[in-house]
C-alpha cells in the first residue's frame, strides 16, 4: 500500500523515476495525477519486493494505462531474476492517490 499527497513537487523529480516508455501514459491524462500514480505504484512494488538497491527508473516499469478515477495497472520489476509482474490497483482523490497490490 502507498498513499501520496496531491502536489506539483512530483514534477521536479519525475526524471528520477519515469522511464521513456512510460511517458505515453503521462501525456494522455492529468500530468500530476499520472506522475503521482507512477511514483506510488513503484513505491508499492518496492515494498513487496525482497530486493535491495532498487532503482525506480531502471528496475521498475509501469505499462501504459488510461488514467481514470480508479483502476488497475500492470507493472513489472527487472531487479530480481524472476522479473515479477504486478497488478496494481489505484484510486485517485482530490487530495491524494492510493495504490495497493498483493503477491500471488
Language model: regions and residue ranges:
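Core catalytic alpha/beta fold that binds nucleotide/phospho-ligands
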Residues: 1-104
Amino acid at each position: 500500500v502507498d498513499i501520496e499527497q496531491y502536489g506539483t513537487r512530483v514534477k521536479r523529480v519525475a526524471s528520477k523515476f519515469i522511464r521513456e516508455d512510460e511517458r505515453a501514459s503521462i501525456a494522455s491524462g492529468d500530468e500530476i495525477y499520472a506522475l503521482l500514480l507512477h511514483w506510488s505504484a513503484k513505491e508499492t512494488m518496492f515494498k513487496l519486493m525482497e530486493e535491495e538497491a532498487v532503482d525506480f527508473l531502471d528496475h521498475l516499469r509501469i505499462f501504459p494505462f488510461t488514467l481514470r478515477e480508479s483502476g488497475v495497472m500492470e507493472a513489472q520489476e527487472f531487479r530480481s531474476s524472476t522479473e515479477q509482474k504486478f497488478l496494481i490497483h489505484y484510486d485517485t482523490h482530490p487530495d491524494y492517490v492510493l495504490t495497493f497490490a498483493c503477491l500471488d
